[in-house]
Amino acid sequence: MGVHILSTGSSVPNFSVENQQFEDIIETSDHWISTRTGIKKRHLAPSSTSLTKLAAEAANDALSKASINAEDIDLIILATSTPDDLFGSASQLQAEIGATSSTAFDITAACSGFIIALVTASQFIQAGSYNKVLVVGADTMSRWIDWSDRSSCILFGDGAGAVLIGESSINSILGFKLCTDGRLNSHLQLMNSPSDSQQFGLTTVPKGRYDSIRMNGKEVYKFAVFQVPIVIKNCLNDVNISIDEVDWFILHQANIRILEAIATRLSIPLSKMITNLENYGNTSAASIPLALDEAIKEKKIQPGQVVVLAGFGAGLTWGAIVLKWQ
């Protein structure tokens, strides 16, 4: 039983912040940011724009393109690390788009979340459990940024991307590999940092509260540049496809220096990498489906082409998927 990508969709907040605007709050410049990250601007969600709203807009975009009603969806998987509700926002997304017949749950894996969610969805279809599955990668990382931290506040943007997949005799997903190394988890974290507590005799019970995102940029860079080319090569070897046979690479949009270094290690031209960093920044779980949707809109990806998706992020987690575009 095959898995076919039926459509894609995306959404970003209307409000955006350009590099020059950071000069008013931290010691930086447009030149410093753009040369080190490849980012020119990023879209940020105001208080009136929820994670669920962005995810629903991307989902409805994908459903509209496939001419499929929300009631026909069997399963919704929302990849996010920034839900509106700590218990998860997939059920809120289900209600928002009217997918009343579907099961819905969240996957939390930061910037690798979409890759893991798409693999999970494909396995449900191949097992015969579900027919149509909506996968959404969405994050509002701006909610968790320390705006005085120059190393991280310039990187992140908010957004959502969606992919609708279904059962088919044609198989779009040729292979995948997923990896985790929890020993490296301290390099990228958003930790519970209690500021209050309740005392029960001699025992203190802390009250939950999360801190801002903390990242060791040098270690994340070394990790991504070393591990991502390996997982891509291994994934391609498993399906007997060479690097030269790949038409497009869509990697998590972390920063341009990571993408350039990975391209060098894979011995591929940077022109084979689809990037949208300049306009969106690092949108975490949304970055890959957002870039995929734009590439399809721009008619870069054509039927019959081989596309590699690869994500990497907190955990530390990473993975790759090989697609044959149909």
UniProtKB/Swiss-Prot annotation:
Keywords: Acyltransferase, Chloroplast, Fatty acid biosynthesis, Fatty acid metabolism, Lipid biosynthesis, Lipid metabolism, Multifunctional enzyme, Plastid, Transferase. Its EC number is 2.3.1.180. Pathway: Lipid metabolism; fatty acid biosynthesis. It is found in: Plastid, Chloroplast. The keyword Lipid metabolism applies. It is an enzyme of class 2 (transferase). Homodimer. The last Arg residue of the ACP-binding site is essential for the weak association between ACP/AcpP and FabH. This is Beta-ketoacyl-[acyl-carrier-protein] synthase III. It comes from Porphyra purpurea. The gene is fabH.
